[in-house]
Amino acid sequence: VVSIKKIKYMRGYLLKSNKLVCLIIISFFLLSCNNSGRSDNTADKKTTKIQKKAIPIIFDTDLGGDFDDVGAMGMLHALADKGEVNILATISCNPSPLVVPSISLINIYFGRPKIPIGSPKSPTRSQDSRELHYHDSLIAHFPSAYKNSDEAPDAVVVYRKVLSQQPDSSVTIVSVGWVTNLRNLLLSKPDSISPLDGKELVAKKVKSWVAMLGGFPEREKEANAVSDTLATQYAIDNWPTPIIFSGYEIGVDVKTGLRLIKEGPVDSPVRMAYAVSIPKRPKNYKYGNGSYDQTSLLVAARGFEPYYSYKTGQFITSDNGSTKWKYDPNGRHKYLVEKMAPDSVAFEIETLMMHNPKNSTE
């Protein structure tokens, strides 16, 4: 028989024990919260420390024929507003009279009127927007610092000036047209801008070249490769730093433009170019336009992952502009291989194309 005294003792013990358990649980909870806060703060500090520095980019575009160049330029400025890239220059490889005025008005719209612009002065292919009429539509609606492409300085001079001012091995060149300017840059001589010749200057200042060019592993004729075949051959054969190729097959299924037209800023030149062009060829653009140029810029700004993998080797061009690939694990060339679904890549790209500009005064 348990005595009354013993029962009272046990009851008191249990009450004390429960209080002790509660105190232990509460203490553990508070400690966990405190540790969690410390962990988050540490993570924030680490994130701040490892935050990527804006990638210095020279953007070389034909901005003629296909209007994906306009989409890529909108995307370029969106990435700059996000702090992911630093736009050093926007250069035309296309001497068509309306190209430089169009480049200028896009830069102005996005609040960057002072970005250097260059245009080729040597003979090369000239192409306007043909029956799509997006050049003249843009020029009629938006202010530009240029009336004609001839007013812009020589592309090679702009390249040499910009490169000479940058840290060594820092610049990424993104070309989304034919590569006449890059051939001419390699052939340029020492001058008052730099004591280095073109190839030496590229080797010293350029980290990599990302090109929308060719088709892989081989393609008979891709527009940018055949537009100036001699320039294509010379530039690729003599380029002293790594080259990444985004082939025709990468951009063709990355369809953009329809959401931009429906939901994009009504005053945007990027939206206007697509809104003017897509209805002109309803069968071709039923699901939007291919994002050939945008995929090149995406990789230049954000790297391969999670969008693409790549193959390493050597890009080989022929006299007629057809392209082939020689696999070589030690090669300096890479071409993109699809990894993320094209629709997912398209959504990310088109979101950038729909960007509303900040009031930047760079």
Which residues make up each language-model segment?
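Bacterial Sec-dependent N-terminal signal peptides
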Residues: 1-49, 362
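N-terminal acidic, glycine/proline-rich low-complexity segments
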Residues: 34-362
